[in-house]
A protein has these predicted regions:
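Secondary-structure junction/capping motif
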Residues: 16, 105, 117, 144, ...
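Generic alpha-helix initiation/capping and coil-helix boundary signal
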Residues: 2, 6-8, 118, 149, ...
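Hydrophobic alpha-helical segments and their boundary regions
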Residues: 4, 8-9, 41, 93, ...
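N-terminal secretory targeting signals
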Residues: 1-47, 51-57, 278, 282-293
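Domain-terminus/edge residues, biased toward the C-terminal soluble/receptor-binding domains
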Residues: 161-165, 173-293
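A residue-level detector for conformationally permissive "hinge/kink" positions
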Residues: 5-7, 48, 105, 163, ...
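Active-site-adjacent loops and short helices of periplasmic peptidoglycan-processing enzymes
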Residues: 25-181, 185-194
C-alpha cells in the first residue's frame, strides 16, 4: 500500500521537474544534506529520477535538479558527438601517453602504442568505461580534445541540458557536472543510436593488442540479470561523484529512464535500481494508465 501512496505524491509533469535551475555543484556538506531529503523508497543515492520514456511522466524524483559531478556518465556524450560527427568507425587510432590519467592515476590495459579502431574504442568506453578509450576518442576528434569538449557542451545546450558542463571526455574531472533532469534528456537522445544501445549493453567484449587478447566485462552487473531488459546504460564513479548509474530499461510494460547519482558503496546503485523496479512493478505496471505526449 505504501507504493500506491507514493505514486500520488511523486507523479509530476515531466516539464515541471525538467525545468532549468542553475546551481553550483554541492560540496561535502551539501551532498550530506541531499541524502537527508525525504525519500519514501529509502534509496542510497543522493539523487534519483525515474521517468516514463514514452509519456515523459516522472514516476519518482529525489533532488532531480541538484548539480553533481557525474564521473563516467560523461562518456555517453563523448560517444554521441563522435557518432554525430560521422567519423570513420574503422579508422585505427593509437593510444598515446596523452591518454594516460595523471589526475586520478586510474589504471588501464590499453598501453601507449596500442592500436584500436574507433569502433573498438567506443565499445570499450561505453561497456567497460575505459578511460584511455574515451580520451583517445576525444583526442582524435576533428580539431582535437578541445573541439570535442566544446561540441559536447554545444550538444548539451541543444538538448536543453542547462545544468550540465563537460570539461573533458572521460569523466575523471570533477568539473564534469550535471543533474538527473539533464542526464535523463541525454539518455533519451543516446538511445536513438543503435551502436550505443548495443555496445553499452554487451556483457563482454575482447580486443587484440600487441600482448594478446584483452577481455573486458560490462561494469553494470544488472546486464546479466534476466529480470532486467536494459536498452542503454552507463555506470560512473569517482570519489567526488559517488557511484552513478543511468539506464533506459523496460520494466513491465513501461520503458523507463532511470538516473541514480552519488550512491555510497559499490553495490548501492544496483540495489537502488532493484528497489525502483519493484516500486514501478507494484504501482505502475502498464502505460495504459498514463497519458501520452
Amino acid at each position: 500500500m505504501i507504493y500506491k501512496a507514493l505514486l500520488g505524491s511523486t507523479l509530476l509533469a515531466f516539464s515541471m521537474v525538467f525545468s532549468p535551475v542553475v546551481q553550483a555543484a554541492p560540496g561535502q556538506t551539501e551532498r550530506a544534506h541531499l541524502k537527508q531529503a525525504h525519500d519514501p523508497l529509502s534509496l542510497n543515492s543522493s539523487v534519483a529520477l525515474v521517468a516514463d520514456a514514452d509519456s515523459l511522466e516522472v514516476l519518482y524524483a529525489k533532488n532531480p535538479s541538484a548539480v553533481l559531478p557525474i564521473a563516467s556518465i560523461t562518456k555517453i556524450m563523448t560517444v554521441v558527438v563522435t557518432l554525430e560527427a560521422g567519423l570513420d568507425l574503422d579508422e585505427v587510432i593509437t593510444i598515446t601517453t596523452d591518454d594516460i590519467d595523471y589526475y586520478k592515476n586510474t589504471r588501464s590495459r590499453l598501453k601507449p602504442g596500442s592500436e584500436f579502431t574507433r569502433r573498438e574504442l567506443i565499445h570499450l568506453a561505453l561497456m567497460a568505461s575505459e578511460n584511455r578509450a574515451a580520451s583517445a576518442l576525444g583526442r582524435s576528434y576533428p580539431g582535437g580534445l578541445a573541439a570535442c569538449v566544446a561540441q559536447m557542451n554545444r550538444r548539451a545546450a541543444s538538448l536543453r541540458m542547462f545544468n550540465t558542463n563537460f570539461a573533458e571526455t572521460t569523466g575523471l574531472s570533477v568539473e564534469n557536472k550535471s543533474s538527473a533532469n539533464d542526464l535523463a534528456r541525454m539518455v533519451l537522445h543516446a538511445q536513438r543510436f543503435p551502436l550505443i544501445r548495443q555496445f553499452s549493453t554487451d556483457p563482454q567484449f575482447s580486443v587484440q593488442s600487441s600482448k594478446g587478447q584483452l577481455n573486458f566485462r560490462n561494469t553494470n552487473r544488472l546486464i546479466k540479470n534476466k529480470e532486467w531488459d536494459i536498452q542503454v546504460q552507463k555506470t560512473g564513479f569517482i570519489n567526488e561523484a559517488g557511484r552513478c548509474l543511468v539506464m533506459k530499461a523496460r520494466v513491465g510494460d513501461r520503458n523507463l529512464v532511470i538516473v541514480l547519482l552519488d550512491a555510497l558503496g559499490s553495490q548501492a546503485r544496483f540495489a537502488d535500481a532493484e528497489r525502483i523496479r519493484e516500486y514501478v512493478m507494484a504501482v505502475a505496471p502498464s502505460t495504459a494508465a498514463y497519458a501520452t505526449k
